[in-house]
Amino acid sequence: MKLFVYHTPELTPTDHLPDCAVVIDVLRATTTIATALEAGAEAVQTFRDIDQLMETSDRWLPEKRIRAGERGGAKVEGFDLGNSPLDCTPEQMGGKRLFLTTTNGTRALQRVEKSPTVITAAIINRQATVNYLLDRQPETVWLVGSGWEGGYSLEDTVCAGAIAQSLVTALVQGIGMGNDEVTAAIALYSQFQNNLLQLFHQSSHGQRLLRLNCDEDLKYCAQPDLLGVLPIQKEPSVLVKFC
């Protein structure tokens, strides 16, 4: 297995794709996706464009859909939910499709959607991600951070480092570092693995969410291995629970 870390979707190569792309948006899209599927959503369908989301979701019965999204961390006006994973309860999600648009995570998903396998990862489902990669052993793996509007983010990098460190520990000689970003991500995780919430508070997007009174979201997003669910792309932009 050869492992690569890319801090934003814009930094990924444009002339080829990996065997498996792992999209990371810890604050908060991939945390929300995992939580929604664990809570019983039949699928999560992601969109970059709000108008496209509205057009597609209009084809679904109101009782079978939930529209969720944020721009700049704040809920999109007229939507059912924002992008808080804490809103993804079984009562809200059960048997419904979540139509989701976010500032960063949905852009990253679109960038790699043509890869043979696309999964999403966050701190809360790190071990499920690692288990899948160890079981399937894809030849090339990209860990793609969503960043913030094209820029680097601490929280996505530390999650990539958590996944990479577990893979390196398990595979020892059976893994190759595809770029220096892998080593840097592991180093960041090694430094903050016992205090992820502190790191999130220091990150620019974490501070943005704190200003929006999303303290509880940060606490939730910082809990390692809380869920055993693995979101996997069934078709472009549509994620389901891997079984």
Curated annotation (Swiss-Prot):
Keyword Ubl conjugation part of the UniProt annotation: no
Keyword tags: Hydrolase, Magnesium
Disulfide partners: none
EC code(s) of this entry: 3.1.3.71
Cofactor(s) named in the record: Mg(2+)
UniProt record similarity statement: Belongs to the ComB family.
NCBIfam families: PRK00886.1-5
Cross-referenced HAMAP family: ComB
Name recorded for this polypeptide: Probable 2-phosphosulfolactate phosphatase
Source organism per UniProt: Rippkaea orientalis (strain PCC 8801 / RF-1)
Gene name of this polypeptide: comB
